[in-house]
């Protein structure tokens, strides 16, 4: 338990019905009792833990500050696993600021960003994946991302990782036995068995990595660029997806001169959608800037939607844009299907893949549902929905998993080549440490500090 007692407002600042001040640490009860007086006249600590108590907060001069409810949560049955007092007051900014200031006067210090959750981690109530899931819950963009974050907060990923670590620890124990007692005939240790154990763990890691793409999209949104030459219906497509007239639509080419960026949920998939200026050669200075932005967005996007005018044949401008997008994850939208098709769909599908070329009318909305279905398959895979397995939450976890797999691959190769057992053990131990860094079992202090510094004050 940390020695210092900390406090912070844990609800959003601003006008609201209720605001909450949290006090956590060894002296949380003493701090709370200095400013809160129960209407019954009893001390807060005299009530059973986790009992909501009605009363008032008073200033140092005895004047009334607010009518409140207070609750004392005794360690370890609290968010931080420390003694915690929470005071629920009216949600006005001045009331919250005054009560918080009184906690400082009573001996608490301001909590740092993420310090409550950091203490929950350091006190062993949650692991690092669960701590990261707390912020994912707060920042959820969709029902699917909330469901995934809640699942991770319950420790699903950590359980799988600890299962892998346990299996690898068994490998190390057996290897050490052979190294220390070479004269013994230990049946559990053969090069073939080591290879099999390592291979099983690699398969499990590959399964987790296969979901990393989905987890990242649900957490951060899929950065998507709508590109094409002028007047193919990019802005009309944006408006159709948004179901509102967000972008100006005109029969004149070059109407969109800047990037229009919007966030939307399309069948539960969070998109960060950018409608770009039409890509073409132009002498117009302002339009030229927009075209350059479009080219850059095409390169930076995680998904490119290439729009072509299906009522006309492909031009050299279309071909140049399609070539630029061919090295990116992309889908080809053959727009204006309501006007008849002059584009060779078979040739496009042979070039880009049958499932990546689809017809659509941004005017009549025909084909929009097909695009939504394609997008769900792109994000979730063939299942088309969130599976029951564990998901990697962020780039840190993905990087460590890939490094752990690389170490295990090297261990497997060493076993296949019948290298000394201690060489194999080094690689397996490294994988164990890397997996432990994901859950926080082996992580360094500076990494912990960096992770929790990204949290908001009061969490």
PLM segments and residue spans:
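Generic enzyme active-site microenvironment
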Residues: 273, 307, 333
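C-terminal-of-GTPase-core extension/linker across diverse P-loop GTPases
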Residues: 2-9, 13, 143-265, 282-284, ...
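Switch I (G2) and immediately adjacent beta-strands of P-loop GTPase domains
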Residues: 54-65, 70-74, 255-282, 300
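Short, Asp-centered acidic motifs that coordinate Mg2+ and/or phosphate
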Residues: 271, 303, 331
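A glycine-rich (often HGG/GG-containing) alpha/beta subdomain
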Residues: 1-147, 151, 155, 331
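Short glycine-/small-residue-rich Rossmann-like dinucleotide-binding loops
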Residues: 242, 277-278, 302, 309, ...
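Inter-motif core of Ras-like GTPase G domains
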Residues: 287-311
């Amino acid at each position: 338990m940390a020695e210092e007692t900390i406090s912070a407002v844990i609800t959003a600042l601003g006008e609201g019905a209720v605001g909450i001040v949290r006090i956590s640490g060894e002296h949380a009860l003493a701090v709370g009792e200095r400013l809160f007086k129960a209407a019954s006249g009893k001390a807060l600590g005299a009530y059973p833990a986790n009992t909501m108590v009605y009363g008032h907060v008073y200033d140092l001069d005895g004047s009334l500050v607010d009518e409140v409810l207070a609750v004392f949560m005794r360690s370890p049955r609290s968010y931080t696993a420390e003694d915690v007092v929470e005071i629920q007051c009216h949600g006005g900014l001045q009331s919250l600021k005054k009560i918080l200031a009184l906690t400082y006067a009573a001996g608490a210090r301001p909590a740092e960003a993420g310090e409550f959750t950091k203490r929950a981690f350091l006190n062993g109530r949650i692991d690092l994946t669960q701590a990261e899931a707390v912020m994912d819950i707060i920042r959820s963009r969709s029902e699917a991302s909330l469901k995934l974050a809640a699942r991770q907060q319950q420790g699903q990923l950590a359980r799988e990782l600890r299962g892998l670590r346990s299996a690898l620890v068994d490998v190390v124990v057996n290897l050490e036995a052979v190294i220390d007692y070479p004269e013994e005939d230990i049946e559990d240790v053969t090069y073939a068995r080591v290879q099999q154990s390592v291979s099983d763990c690699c398969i499990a890691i590959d399964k987790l990595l296969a979901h990393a793409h989905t987890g990242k999209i649900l957490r951060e949104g899929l950065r998507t660029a709508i590109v094409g030459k002028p007047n193919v219906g990019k802005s009309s497509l944006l408006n159709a997806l948004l179901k509102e007239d967000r972008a100006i639509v005109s029969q004149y080419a070059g109407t969109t001169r800047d990037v229009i960026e919007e966030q939307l949920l399309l069948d539960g998939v969070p998109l960060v959608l950018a409608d770009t200026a039409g890509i073409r050669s132009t002498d117009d200075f302002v339009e030229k800037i927009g075209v350059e932005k479009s080219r850059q967005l095409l390169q930076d996007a995680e998904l490119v939607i290439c729009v072509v005018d299906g009522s006309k044949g492909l031009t050299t401008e279309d071909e140049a844009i399609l070539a630029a997008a061919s090295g990116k994850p992309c889908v080809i939208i053959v727009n204006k299907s309501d006007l008849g098709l002059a584009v060779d769909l078979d040739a496009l599908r042979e070039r880009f893949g049958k499932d990546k070329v689809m017809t659509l009318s941004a005017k009549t909305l025909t084909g929009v549902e097909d695009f939504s279905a394609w997008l769900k398959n792109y994000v979730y895979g063939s299942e088309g929905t969130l599976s029951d397995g564990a998901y990697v939450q962020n780039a840190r976890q993905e990087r460590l998993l890939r490094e752990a797999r690389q170490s295990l691959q090297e261990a497997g190769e060493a076993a296949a080549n019948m290298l000394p057992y201690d060489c194999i053990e080094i690689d397996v131990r490294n994988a164990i440490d890397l997996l432990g860094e994901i859950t926080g079992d082996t992580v360094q202090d500076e990494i912990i500090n960096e992770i929790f510094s990204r949290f908001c004050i009061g969490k």
